[in-house]
Curated annotation (Swiss-Prot):
Catalysis: reaction(s): a 2'-deoxyribonucleoside 5'-diphosphate + ATP = a 2'-deoxyribonucleoside 5'-triphosphate + ADP; a ribonucleoside 5'-diphosphate + ATP = a ribonucleoside 5'-triphosphate + ADP
HAMAP family xref list: NDP_kinase
Organism: Haloquadratum walsbyi (strain DSM 16790 / HBSQ001)
Encoding gene per record: ndk
Function noted in UniProt: Major role in the synthesis of nucleoside triphosphates other than ATP. The ATP gamma phosphate is transferred to the NDP beta phosphate via a ping-pong mechanism, using a phosphorylated active-site intermediate.
SUPFAM superfamilies per record: Nucleoside diphosphate kinase, NDK (SSF54919)
An annotated GO cellular component: cytoplasm
Signal peptide as annotated in the record: none
Upper taxonomic lineage: Archaea, Methanobacteriati, Methanobacteriota, Stenosarchaea group, Halobacteria
Cofactor(s) essential for the protein: Mg(2+)
Transferase found in the keyword field: yes
Protein name as it appears in the record: Nucleoside diphosphate kinase
Length: 158
């Protein structure tokens, strides 16, 4: 039986203002590192309205768009780029459903999300092939991303 090798890729993740204010950045980073993903970029930033509207552009015609922009610009966020085999799919699985009430226990939103508006974290959509690259470029310059080999890589990848 032949299995196709997983795609080694980068994915964008952002701890939202509610997650930052609740001190969840370290816990979230630990979960992804424990999974074998590599943090290749991370920084605090505060989104201005223009960046927020660009980032959430696919929701611009939805009734909650203005509230979403107001929320995401209300405080600092922690933007990250993770790298690993099937990184986007792994991250989405660990993050859980958009609505924390529908997220399984053990997922980040299932454990820490309070409601649909305060769901702690954003992660690139694995169904939108261009989302990762678009979001990474919106938040990071290439010079801010560092690829390196983790000491446990030989145990994780063949």
């Amino acid at each position: 039986m032949s299995e196709e090798a997983p795609v080694h890729e980068r994915t964008f993740v952002m701890v939202k203002p509610d997650g930052v204010q609740r001190g969840l950045i370290g816990e979230i980073i630990s979960r992804f590192e424990d999974r074998g993903l590599t943090l290749v970029g991370g920084k605090f930033t505060r989104l201005d309205t223009e960046v927020a509207r660009d980032h959430y552009g696919e929701h611009k015609d939805k009734p909650f768009f203005d509230d979403l922009v107001s929320f995401i610009t209300a405080g600092p966020v922690f933007a990250m780029v993770w790298e690993g085999a099937d990184a986007t799919r792994q991250v989405r699985s660990m993050v859980g459903e958009t609505d924390p009430a529908e997220s399984a226990p053990g997922t980040i939103r299932g454990d820490y999300g309070l409601d649909l508006g305060r769901n702690v974290i954003h992660a690139s959509d694995h169904e939108d092939e261009g989302a990762n690259e678009r979001e990474i470029q919106l938040f990071f310059d290439e010079s801010e991303l560092y690829t390196y080999e983790r000491i446990d890589d030989p145990w994780l990848y063949e």
